[in-house]
């Protein structure tokens, strides 16, 4: 029922109040004992009616560009990891039974060394110094930025509705170029168009939302909806 509500209300994800998001360890799927329960900020709290007359409250993350921000060790990545796993249904006792994300959402991260085969990366990568054509790009050993650009294009082809991105596992030069760096390296000398320059078009023209964890760069505030 909640998955249907996401579509109806133009939400990409829902996380119920009282959910236990941290895991016992990095290699365990069991909930962390005595963990702090999740509580939605009032400004984003919604109620969803369940079958048989019950209802559940929690955070509803709308379509568009959403930032998850906060200090270190405050659970930003833990929330994103829970949303990543929210494409699956969870068994009772998992702690994330009511963490629900659209089933076609895609985690996007840098994958240094991955292969890329015949992808048009010109949306992000262009005018390479070696003259290599990025409209049909192949490599057996992609850099972090190239691999993440490839992930975006593969997501578009797969018709994903939402990218889930953590600043910590991304290639910095793929996500953003600050104003100082733009002055040091002019646009005609930089072959990478950062994700921040495309994130609005991805939503407004293609219908792909983004949920992004940010802890060190405030650049995405200017393009975020939430």
PLM region descriptions:
Residues 1-34:
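Long, basic/Gly/Ser/Thr-rich N-terminal segments
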Residues 19, 73-74, 111-113, 167-170, ...:
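Short, ordered loop/turn segments at secondary-structure junctions
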Residues 114, 124-145, 176-192:
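Flexible beta-alpha connector loops of hexameric P-loop NTPases
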Residues 156-199, 203-204, 216-225:
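Conserved P-loop NTPase nucleotide-binding/switch module
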Residues 56-88:
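Glycine-rich phosphate-binding P-loop
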Residues 135-170:
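Phosphate-binding/switch loop-helix module in NTP-utilizing enzymes
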Residues 1, 144-152, 203-208:
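Phosphate-interacting basic helix/loop segments used at nucleotide- and nucleic-acid interfaces
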Residues 22-57, 92, 100-105, 109-116, ...:
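N-terminal pre-Walker A segment at the start of P-loop NTPase domains
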């Amino acid at each position: 029922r909640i998955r249907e509500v996401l579509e109806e209300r133009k939400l990409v994800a829902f996380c119920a109040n009282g959910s236990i998001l941290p895991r016992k360890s990095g290699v365990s799927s069991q909930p962390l004992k005595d963990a702090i329960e999740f509580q939605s900020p009032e400004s984003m709290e919604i109620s969803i009616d369940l079958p048989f007359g019950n209802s559940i409250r929690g955070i509803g993350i709308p379509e568009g560009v959403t930032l998850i921000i906060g200090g270190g060790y405050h659970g930003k990545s833990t929330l994103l990891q829970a949303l990543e796993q929210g494409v699956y249904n969870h068994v009772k006792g998992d702690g994330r039974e009511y963490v629900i994300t659209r089933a076609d959402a895609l985690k996007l991260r840098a994958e240094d060394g991955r292969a890329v085969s015949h992808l048009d990366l010109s949306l992000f990568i262009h005018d390479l110094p070696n003259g290599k054509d990025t409209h049909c790009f192949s490599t057996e050993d992609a850099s972090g930025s190239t691999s993440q650009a490839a992930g975006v294009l593969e997501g578009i082809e797969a018709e994903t509705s939402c990218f889930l991105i953590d600043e910590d596992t991304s290639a910095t030069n793929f996500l953003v170029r600050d104003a100082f760096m733009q002055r040091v390296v002019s646009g005609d000398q930089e072959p990478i168009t950062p994700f921040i320059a495309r994130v609005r078009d991805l939503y407004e023209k293609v219908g792909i939302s983004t949920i992004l964890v940010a802890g060190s760069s405030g650049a995405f505030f200017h393009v975020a909806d939430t």
